[in-house]
Amino acid sequence: MSPNPQFLFDFGSPNAFLSHEAIPAIEKRTGVKFDYVPVLLGGVYKATGNMSPGESLRGIKNKPEYNALETERFLRRHNITTFKSNPFFPVNTLMLMRGVVAADFEGLFEPYFRAAYHHMWSEP
């Protein structure tokens, strides 16, 4: 049997939140179970000399409008009603991501994960 697909996430990524919201239907439809793996995106960007799409695409004509349209399409397609833009975005998630690793060691991954995502993207 092949290994479970991994879902790499950072609480600060709205796209990761939206993907997470779509995963239960994928798991139900396919019978696969995703393994959730925390990844500090800021660290990845720094280590690779890159920057977030929000920074690298800033100033491109019509990009914010297109992103908003695509987000709305995704929300409708996956029947996601819990998403709200975070007025504090972008957020430094270093402590949140360290916290989820610690919570996992303590057997508290699920409640920590749900609370962090809820307060980041459902009720910021």
Regions flagged by a language model, labelled:
Residues 1-22:
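Local sequence-structure signature of Cys/Sec-based thiol-disulfide redox active-site neighborhoods
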Residues 18-120:
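Structural alpha/beta surface segment adjacent to cysteine/selenocysteine redox centers
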